[in-house]
Amino acid sequence: MIRTFADNASEDLFNGVDSRRARSACPRELWPIVRRKLTQLNRVRDLRELAIPPGNRLERLSGSRKGQHSIRVNQQCRVCFRWEEGHADEVEITDYH
């Protein structure tokens, strides 16, 4: 379950709000995919559930994002988050590369 968002843009996308912040977070054509990924993240109770479907490409991040995980939206866009006590915290949509 999602507990917190890292920014308002990601929260707007999750809630289906068409805001300037949401438009700056990722291209509009990706919004349906982003919402589907965020809904999936909100439903899981165990991090391993995000490994299915394989297209999510669940990853543990390193470097400046150590402690975070990500699932893939497309080649560049990711949903990044911290997984703690069965919940997703600091959820954000980002161009990871």
What is each model feature region?
Residues 1, 9, 46, 54-57, ...:
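Glycine-rich, flexible loop/turn motifs
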Residues 1-37:
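Arg/Lys-rich, positively charged N-terminal/basic patches that mediate binding to nucleic acids
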Residues 26-54:
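Short, solvent-exposed, low-complexity loop/linker segments
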Residues 45-69:
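A short, surface-exposed loop/turn module that caps and links secondary-structure elements
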Residues 62, 69-97:
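Enriched for short, Lys/Arg-rich terminal
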